[in-house]
Amino acid sequence: MKMLRALLLCLSLVFFLAFQIVVSEIQLGSKLVVGENTLWVSNNGDFALGFFNPPGLLNRFSIGIWFNSNSIPYDQRKVVWVAGAGVVVSDNSSYFELTRNGELVLFDSLLGVPVWNSKTNRFSVSSALLRDDGNLVLLKDREEIVWQSFGTPTDTLLPNQKFPAFEMLRAASENSRSSYYSLHLEDSGRLELRWESNITFWSSGNEVVKKKKKKKNIGAVLTSEGALFLEDQDLMRPVWSVFGEDHNDTVKFRFLRLDRDGNLRMYSWNEDSRIWKPVWQAVENQCRVFATCGSQVCSFNSSGYTECNCPFNAFVSVSDPKCLVPYQKPGCKSGFNMVKFKNLELYGIYPANDSVISQISSQRCKKLCLENSACTAVTYTNDGEPQCRMKLTRYISGYSDPSLSSISYVKTCLDPIAVDPNNVSKESPVTVTKSHSICIPCLVGATSTTLVLFLGFQLGIVVYIYRRKKKLAKKKAERFSKATNPKGVMIFSVDEIKAMTDNFDNNIGPQIFKGVMPENELVAVKEVEATLTEERKFRSSASKIGTMHHKNLANLEGYCCELGRRFLVYEYAKNGSILDHIVDPLRSKKLTWRIRTDTCLSVAKALCYLHMECREFVSHGNLNCGNILLGEDLEAKLTEYGFGLCAADKDVEDFGKTVLALITGRYEPEGVVSEWVYREWIGGRKETVVDKGLEGCFDVEELERVLRISFWCVQTDERLRPSMGEVVKVLEGTLSVDPPPPPFACARSSPTNSSESSQSLYEP
């Protein structure tokens, strides 16, 4: 028995030594390999650095630091830092190395490229060290810190870790993609919790630094005693503070984390219960965390815990896996109804810009939604000031609670009521009491005569209707010909279109012809398929488009809808389309880097105008390089807008693909170019994707910004795509853009695991 115990003890020691390497100093050339399961451990053993499996990602590995104390069970050893904010590798031969030139590098052997590095090869790094406080540092001359993990936090702060102004924590997400939630410290001295980039749903209070005196030497810090301070280093004192409920208690381990549900919490290790206990949280009511339930509604159950549910299931198809408000089909011929939900507060999340109308009644609020084709739901509140919040998206989140006075109304289509076969009244049985003799020849003669008269009458009606329709159609054509509708758009006949284009003799593109108006004004005439939209909708759309004016939209001069053919007459663009230039090596030389980036911005502004600045939402529906024209000064003008019916996110996706085609000089509608560009970008070879015709004349920083926003636009999950307003700000340089998660199936790390798709391979 003693021999067996001794053997087990030896095996345990061998196992421990095989998986942990306690080092006081990490030498250049040191390496951790996925398949070897080795660790770098701090001197006190409280922290370890190594590869781990992110939750829910089978055969995927990230490199990070976690609590490693023997007093903490393995399932409670929380990760406190991850290289690259969630970068994953998949092959067992992938590794993390402190290279000879002083860089920390995470290398994916399957892709054959480094997917993250510390970018410290110019700092004369001599060694690395995982300190007892959990900070991984790179040292110059074994003393001076030139890089530290505390300086690149992910979602967690450890005691005494500084959180300076303009720094950010980003919550982890279940699929390892970049999360929607982030924590920011403004230079005004205020901590802010944000959803995406523009929704602040919690802050630490009023600004503590006056606007004229904003400065960078203000920071947040979690103390080992369990307090969170905002410190002004000039004043040498806290300007804001909160305390955990166990403040000043003897607790060995603490951390502050931005959790996946969007709330900021302070945790302490409880030795008695052997669990991490939350001792403070920023948002007391979890349902007040913006979009904490995604596109569902948050509420509290009888046990006091939050739960997410979908109140719209009764109005959507059972085949729709998402909880979305009903799709407002334009062809709903039976009208719309507003379904009432008491004690429910709704708000749009994609995009998160509800239209707010004050001093209004609930009836008027509902009516406005019914009159607006883009409106999907409204929330009405009257807490002293009546307010109507109109949602213009199907992606809606909310909060339900009996204490809420809010009333929400969801727009639904009134489908025709089908006849219930169970309610159809059955005929009463007829009892024949007496039989009579029947004259068969008389019956046949009468029936034949009646049938002939009936058919003759029907034939007469058909002939009359046909002749009347033909006459009305002729009058209608004459009425529209050589006319202008009330909104100023010319309406032409087919004969006029033929005369204008010299019988379609001058073809300048696919179904596009050069024409001359009677006033010698040059125009471009585009023939569109008559099957795309019915005549009434085509005329309505053309009339509406004629009222739109933006410098980056080609003016619609007129249209033709006659004899089964449809034409659009646009102002003439001298230099043709972007597609004409991309496919022609000689013409592509006109597209300098500045022209290309200006074109991206111009198209973004045009789409932003259509989506957000018109009285009603207008989609493009078919954006591509072929319908972006270049005027005399090579200024972009968008055509064929307003006739396609689609959601905003489809236009955003098409925009991203178009931008990538413009930057690379390669046009592939199937999206092959987009996937290739992403692989090059993630491999650190972004310069190779630029059109060779530019001969290296481009701005690297601008290229990075354009590629990042393009990858966000083409995300497979449409909820991750930005609004066109955000795209404009990014391209203008007034809004920063985070590194995007892999947008395509091609960005998977392993071809053998197709179910585990789209993992994050980006730099922080």
From Swiss-Prot:
Stored InterPro entries: Bulb-type_lectin_dom, Bulb-type_lectin_dom_sf, Kinase-like_dom_sf, Pan_app, Prot_kinase_dom, S_locus_glycoprot_dom, Ser-Thr/Tyr_kinase_cat_dom, SRK-like_kinase
Q: What class of enzyme is it?
A: transferase
Give me the gene this protein comes from.
SD31
A molecular-function term among this protein's GO annotations:
ubiquitin protein ligase binding
What's the superkingdom here? Answer: Eukaryota
The UniProt entry, under SMART domains, shows: B_lectin (SM00108), PAN_AP (SM00473)
Enumerate the UniProt keywords alphabetically. Answer: ATP-binding, Cell membrane, Disulfide bond, EGF-like domain, Glycoprotein, Kinase, Lectin, Membrane, Nucleotide-binding, Receptor, Repeat, Serine/threonine-protein kinase, Signal, Transferase, Transmembrane, Transmembrane helix
Record protein name field: G-type lectin S-receptor-like serine/threonine-protein kinase SD3-1
Q: Where does ATP bind?
A: I508, G509, P510, Q511, I512, F513, K514, G515, V516, K526
Q: How does it sit in the membrane?
A: Single-pass type I membrane protein
Q: Which cysteines are joined by disulfide bonds?
A: C287-C298, C293-C308, C332-C413, C365-C388, C369-C375
Keyword Transferase listed: yes
